[in-house]
Design a protein with these regions (language model features):
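A membrane-periplasm/extracellular boundary helix in multi-pass inner-membrane enzymes
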Residues: 18-20, 82, 86-87, 104-157, ...
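Glycine- and aromatic-enriched periplasmic loops at the membrane-periplasm interface
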Residues: 167-173, 183-186
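Alpha-helical transmembrane segments of multi-pass inner-membrane proteins
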Residues: 2-29, 40-110, 133-136
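Generic structural signal for secondary-structure transition and capping sites
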Residues: 10, 179-182
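Luminal/periplasmic active-site loops of membrane-embedded glycosylation enzymes
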Residues: 44-50, 152-166
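Juxtamembrane loop-helix boundary motifs flanking transmembrane segments in multi-pass membrane proteins
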Residues: 27-28, 165, 169
């Protein structure tokens, strides 16, 4: 099942690299970026790439039967993490890493002690890979990705809204629900 979910993500990565081979040429601010998302919505692409980050990490731990598959899965994990980060949409990437943390906790809880050493090694290497990908992403975006995750604009000023204005929408939708709890508004 993991492989069946991973194959379309591999095709998505190929398309994204064909659509936008150079990140430096298209990143100009800290907003979500349609160009680095293959021309699609950055939030949706980030979500599916976050799923890919999780899937390839799980493939590294559970489905790497030999060194060749381990290397292939690790390369795809690194590439999909990079492309997920440079969409400038934080939700999918953060969700992918939260799923990894949850999976690692479950694996550590349910595996025997001799298998735990492999999990620790993979987690350590994953952290090293992520730090390397983050540094490369920061270089490719001239530091704008650091500002995006720090909730700053391109000039380094803190943005007024941590949710890019969504809190107003959330508040109004919640108020409409409270005003019309039975029949709704439309």
């Amino acid at each position: 099942i993991i492989d069946m979910l991973a194959y379309p993500l591999m095709a998505t990565l190929v398309y994204m690299f064909a659509y936008t081979p150079s990140i430096k040429d298209v990143v100009t601010n800290t907003e979500s970026n349609f160009e680095t998302s293959g021309g699609f919505g950055p939030n949706q692409v980030s979500t599916i790439l976050g799923l890919g980050i999780f899937l390839f990490f799980v493939k590294i731990i559970l489905n790497s039967k030999n060194k060749k598959m381990l290397i292939i899965n690790a390369v795809f994990f690194i590439i999909i993490t990079f492309r997920g980060i440079v969409t400038f949409s934080r939700g999918g990437v953060i969700a992918g890493f939260l799923m990894i943390v949850f999976a690692v906790v479950l694996l550590l809880f349910y595996t025997k002690s001799q298998a735990k050493s492999k999990i620790y090694l993979v987690v350590f290497m994953g952290v090293v890979a992520f730090v390397g990908v983050w540094i490369y992403s920061s270089f490719q975006t001239s530091g704008l990705i650091d500002k995006r995750y720090a909730n700053e604009d391109a000039r380094g000023r803190e943005k007024a809204s941590k949710l890019t204005g969504r809190e107003v929408l959330i508040e109004s939708e919640f108020q409409m629900f409270l005003d019309n709890p039975i029949f709704g508004v439309g």
